[in-house]
Amino acid sequence: MKNIYIICTILLMFSSWGQEVSLTQAQSSDFKAKAIERNQAIKTMQADFKQRKHLEFMSKDIETVGKIAYAKPDQLNWQYTAPYRYQIVFQKNTITVNDQGKVSQMKADNKIFKKINALIVSTISGNMFDEKEFSVALYKSTKGVHAKLLPKDKTLLKYMKEIHLFFSSDATVDQVKLIEPTEDYTEITFVNKQFNTPIDASVFKL
């Protein structure tokens, strides 16, 4: 029961641009190569984020802000700063949560935790073009490239129907939209992005 609650909490954390046209096959190949090359060059990332959670049964969307810090290969600190304080740290096979001062830890060694951890890290880095895991469609808009991904994994599909990544001109992710099977969705916009700046090891410890 506790694991189900944590999974739902993580997914709640994460789940339009102008007129779009589909990229040609050649354009898609070129963009994927550019995004992969850019991703390989990123060792660390820090950013502020704004999150909007839309639930059909609520008249008003839930808006939160916070900060993230990411270091390859698998260290991630996702911190909400307003209107409440909540922090979750992924490191190897461990998830540590600080819920307004109450710290708990668990092993992330089951299949769904691993899938979610990989999903979050890949979403931030933009490295999500594994066609064994996703069906991928790419579109060009006035602001950059929009990637629409449909998960193929049946376990992940229980939690996530579609994933939309919006890339800036430098092939890094500006915005993420996660759509659940219920059509509820989460939009996350990254601002003040910094790449390859030093991050103290203490950031990934609670």
Segments and roles (model prediction):
Residues I4-S15:
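Sec-dependent N-terminal signal peptides
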Residues S16-K50, H54-K60, V203-L206:
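N-terminal leader/targeting segments and the immediate start of mature chains
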Residues V21, K67-A118, T186:
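An acidic-aromatic
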Residues A47-F49, E63-V65, F90, F190:
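Extended beta-sheet lipid-handling architectures
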Residues R52, P73-Q75, T81-Y84, N93-I95, ...:
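Solvent-exposed coil/turn segments that connect beta secondary-structure elements
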Residues E56-F57, Y84-Q87, K154-L157, V173:
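Short beta-strands and strand-coil junctions in structured, solvent-facing domains, enriched
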Residues Q105-G144:
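Flexible, surface-exposed loop/linker segments and immediately adjacent secondary-structure boundaries
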Residues F129-S135, K140-L206:
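Gly/Pro-enriched, hydrophobic low-complexity segments
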